UniProtKB/Swiss-Prot annotation:
The gene is PUB12. ARM repeats lie at residues 387-427, 430-469, 471-510, 512-551, 553-592. GO terms for biological process: cell surface receptor signaling pathway; protein ubiquitination. The lineage of its organism: Eukaryota, Viridiplantae, Streptophyta, Embryophyta, Tracheophyta. Residues 337-349 have a biased composition (Low complexity). This is U-box domain-containing protein 12. It comes from Arabidopsis thaliana. It catalyses: S-ubiquitinyl-[E2 ubiquitin-conjugating enzyme]-L-cysteine + [acceptor protein]-L-lysine = [E2 ubiquitin-conjugating enzyme]-L-cysteine + N(6)-ubiquitinyl-[acceptor protein]-L-lysine.
Length: 654
């Protein structure tokens, strides 16, 4: 018996190490650390193969191998986590991730130390090899990352989040994108999904400031990649991203030719100048570069022989011709789209910029519908371009005028422009309060959500999601009656509309007071219907919202009445890891409230599924499975004490 058990156990360990090796090949900022761990474990393979093939066996050896098995499970879970989680998260939370590696290393070292090597029939060479592994593990326990993390990468990511408007930000974005290998549409989509998973796996808890940081950094990387690859298909990112962002088609925003964009700011040049290296830059950008003490050309790294800047009149003329041929107003000096390190101060805006905004504000109040429509459309595009524009437009008093346009029922296009302008302005954190409180925009946005065109309703939902990032806004939005029309959009909207409604509802329902409103608005039946329609592509979002609602008394009652237990058990049986953990989270609430759900779930065969999930699920899934197993165990004990019947006996009587 011991021999057979030892053989199977050794083979299991071999398979685990090989699986860890395959996981460690994934692209991640922790790749080097993963590879080190995998390499050390691979040195154990010859010993395990000999143990598997040897005839001799003992319970002491088997027990030691069981300890190794547990430590390998922890190692596999960690590497799987690192390979699937957000890359930006791994950089920003590097200390937290390193603690996890230290813990796994400690567990491996302890497990390998108790193996009775003197009782194993293995060669001295193999014993020395295992001893080498132990030495390497102990040595790594004394380190806290060392060369695993690139300090420059960490500082660059922090600088991108702080976003102080540096003209050299594009260089930092390039470095970060290249080091994190976020240079293609596939890379960006996966990173967006990883961030969205972090929100979903929070189980209703506010993801917090760290999520906001990661979202902001990802948006800057995405904007950079799209600038250099203007033909990228953005649709998957727009549907899946957890960032609030502009909803205009690429055709609404022409990408200038590369030679017309400053190599530093990556924006259309308004005052191009030539430096001694022969390269052309935006005057203000290269001026700040030189004032920062740099003596080389940013593009060629060639030493600049002088700081003389010669106006490039030919290029300026070509830029003006390109703008005219594409129906774009030629750039003025200085241009409203030009970033500035003082963008947060409206008083520093150039006169031309101020005059341009004032002209648009006058059009917004015009009695002519065409003027209002064109002004709202232009503000929509300007607010999409960069944060400087968003700050300047909001500071000028444009938001209340845009809010007034939300209730215009006879001009759907103006209404779309207005709500999308507010969406784009809301991306700037400091504008959120102005939109919600200073301008009282929420009732108007809700009106659009109820009465607008499908595009306007979609963007209204996206706006509410953006604004609800602030906790106080969740209360205001819920009190304004936004939840019922969001439920309606989730039920009958387009695919993008459903996604927008789901993300907004998820965010709003994090606040306890909104959960009851959502239940009373009929959200639970809509979610249950979407769960049974896999082609809707809304399973992940529906389960995430159900996990939040089921923590509310009304939510538990409604979910239980919807005959949800069989559906949830099916997802635990065959769903994705995220679906399994959210289904288990819902069942934790249901089964703590109604014992009939316990009996029904066990009758459906949930016990084996939970045991498997407790061993091999995600971290959150393991916790939820353990909670359910504990609940089943306590209920069974109670029934035995009171009636002498176990849970299985009760099931047989049903």
């Amino acid at each position: 018996m011991a021999k057979s058990e030892k053989h199977k156990l050794a083979q299991t360990l071999i398979d685990s190490i090989n699986e860890i090796a395959s996981i460690s090949d994934s692209v991640t900022p922790m790749k080097k650390h993963c590879a080190n761990l995998s390499r050390r474990l691979s040195l154990l393979l010859p010993m395990l193969e000999e143990i598997r093939d040897n005839q001799e066996s003992s319970s002491e050896v088997v027990n030691a191998l069981l300890s190794v098995k547990q430590s390998l499970l922890h190692a596999k879970d960690l590497l799987s986590f690192v390979s699937h989680v957000s890359k930006i998260y791994l950089v920003l939370e590097r200390d937290q991730v390193m603690v996890k590696f230290q813990k796994v290393t400690s567990l491996l070292e302890q497990a390998l130390s108790i193996i009775p090597y003197e009782n194993l029939e293995i060669s001295d060479e193999l014993k020395e090899q295992v001893e080498l592994v132990l030495v390497q593990l102990r040595r790594s326990l004394g380190k806290r990352g060392g060369d695993v993390y690139d300090d420059e990468l960490y500082k660059d990511v922090l600088s991108l989040y702080s976003g102080r408007g540096s003209v050299m930000e594009s260089d930092m974005v390039r470095r970060v994108a290249e080091k994190l290998q976020l240079m293609t549409i596939t890379d960006l989509t996966q990173e967006s999904l990883a961030l969205l998973d972090m929100v979903s796996s929070s189980g209703g808890d506010d993801p917090g400031e760290s999520f906001e940081k990661m979202s902001m950094v990802l948006k800057k990387i995405k904007d950079f990649v799209q600038t250099y690859n203007p033909n990228l298909d953005d649709a998957p990112l727009r549907l899946k991203s957890s960032l609030p962002k502009s909803r205009d088609d690429d055709r609404d925003m022409l990408i200038p030719p590369e030679e017309f964009r400053c190599p530093i700011s990556l924006e259309l040049m308004t005052d191009p100048v030539i430096v001694s290296s022969g390269q052309t830059y935006e005057r203000e950008c290269i001026k700040k570069w030189l004032e920062g003490g740099h003596l080389t050309c940013p593009k060629t790294q060639e030493t600049l022989t002088s700081d003389i800047m010669t106006p490039n009149y030919v290029l300026r003329s070509l830029i003006a011709q390109w703008c005219e041929s594409n129906g774009i107003e030629p750039p003025k000096r200085p241009n409203i789209s030009q970033p500035s390190s003082k963008a947060s101060s409206s008083s520093s805006a150039p006169d031309d910029e101020h005059n341009k905004i004032e002209e648009l504000l006058l059009k917004l109040t015009s009695q002519q519908p065409e003027d209002r429509r064109s002004a709202a459309g232009e503000i929509r595009l300007l607010a999409k371009q960069n944060n400087h524009n968003r700050v300047a437009i909001a500071a000028s008093g444009a938001i209340p005028l845009l809010v007034n346009l939300l209730t215009i029922s006879n001009d759907s296009r103006t209404q779309e422009h207005a709500v999308t302008s507010i969406l784009n302005l809301s991306i700037c954190q400091e504008n959120k309060g102005k939109i919600v409180y200073s301008s009282g925009a929420v009732p108007g946005i809700v009106h659009v959500l109820q009465k607008g065109s499908m595009e306007a309703r979609e963007n209204a939902a996206a706006t509410l999601f953006s604004l609800s990032v602030i906790d106080e806004n969740k209360v205001t939005i819920g009190a304004a009656g936004a939840i019922p029309p969001l439920v309606t959009l989730l039920s009958e909207g387009s695919q993008r509309g459903k996604k927008d409604a789901a993300t907004a509802l998820f965010n709003l329902c994090i606040f306890q007071g909104n959960k009851g409103k959502a239940v009373r608005a009929g959200l639970v039946p809509v979610l249950m219907r979407l769960l049974t329609e896999p082609e809707s592509g809304m399973v992940d979002e529906s389960l995430s919202i159900l996990a939040i609602l089921s923590s509310h008394p009304d939510g538990k009652s409604e979910v239980g009445a919807a005959d949800a237990v069989p559906v949830l058990v099916d997802f635990i049986r065959s769903g994705s890891p995220r679906n399994k953990e959210n289904s288990a989270a819902v069942l934790v609430h249901l089964c703590s409230w109604n014992q009939q759900h316990l009996i029904e779930a066990q009758k459906l065969g949930i016990m084996d599924l939970l045991i498997e999930m407790a061993e091999n699920g995600t971290d959150r899934g393991k916790r939820k499975a353990a909670q359910l197993l504990n609940r089943f165990s306590r209920f069974n004990d109670q029934q035995k004490q009171h009636s002498g019947l176990g849970l299985e006996d009760q099931i047989s009587l049903i």
